[in-house]
Amino acid sequence: MPRRRVIGQRKILPDPKFGSELLAKFVNILMVDGKKSTAESIVYSALETLAQRSGKTELEAFETALENVRPTVEVKSRRVGGSTYQVPVEVRPVRRNALAMRWIVEAARKRGDKSMALRLANELSDAAENKGTAVKKREDVHRMAEANKAFAHYRW
């Protein structure tokens, strides 16, 4: 491994409509085959629907949904003396957001609604109300960490 300087992470530009870096990241995660304008229109239309349902602004509603899906702990495999343990570790803030967004997009893609914008709006509104597939995924991850709390001393 070369011992060169560590290259810093690139800053992503905030999205044009709301000026939010978090939303820009969400658009990038939703984007397929480099079709950013399509992804943006899906996200904006989903946020509009979400805002009408919740009575909050688009960004507030999105932030609430994201907050309810963010995991605080996860398990990582750690090999100790021939056996592999699932060790609970705290999730870094950047990864917390990335996982939450990824889970919301995955859950929305699996839904059976007509358009992707509607699926995304429904998943986000479910997440805002602490229900839905993405929230269930977070609960499963937390349950795994809780079950493997005994191996927490193997943390590195």
From Swiss-Prot:
GO function terms (MF aspect): rRNA binding; structural constituent of ribosome; tRNA binding
Give the residue range of the signal peptide. Answer: none
GO biological process terms, semicolon-separated: translation
Q: Quote a single Gene Ontology cellular component term.
A: small ribosomal subunit
Q: Per its UniProt record, what Gene3D superfamilies does this chain match? A: Ribosomal protein S7 domain
Q: Which domain of life is it from?
A: Bacteria
Alphabetized, the UniProt keywords read:
Ribonucleoprotein, Ribosomal protein, RNA-binding, rRNA-binding, tRNA-binding
Q: Which segments cross the bilayer?
A: none
How this chain assembles, per its entry, is: Part of the 30S ribosomal subunit. Contacts proteins S9 and S11.
Q: Which family does it belong to?
A: Belongs to the universal ribosomal protein uS7 family.
This chain's function reads: One of the primary rRNA binding proteins, it binds directly to 16S rRNA where it nucleates assembly of the head domain of the 30S subunit. Is located at the subunit interface close to the decoding center, probably blocks exit of the E-site tRNA.
Q: Which NCBIfam families match?
A: rpsG_bact
Protein name (Swiss-Prot/TrEMBL): Small ribosomal subunit protein uS7
What broad taxonomic lineage does this protein's source fall under? Bacteria, Pseudomonadati, Pseudomonadota, Gammaproteobacteria, Enterobacterales
Gene that specifies this protein: rpsG
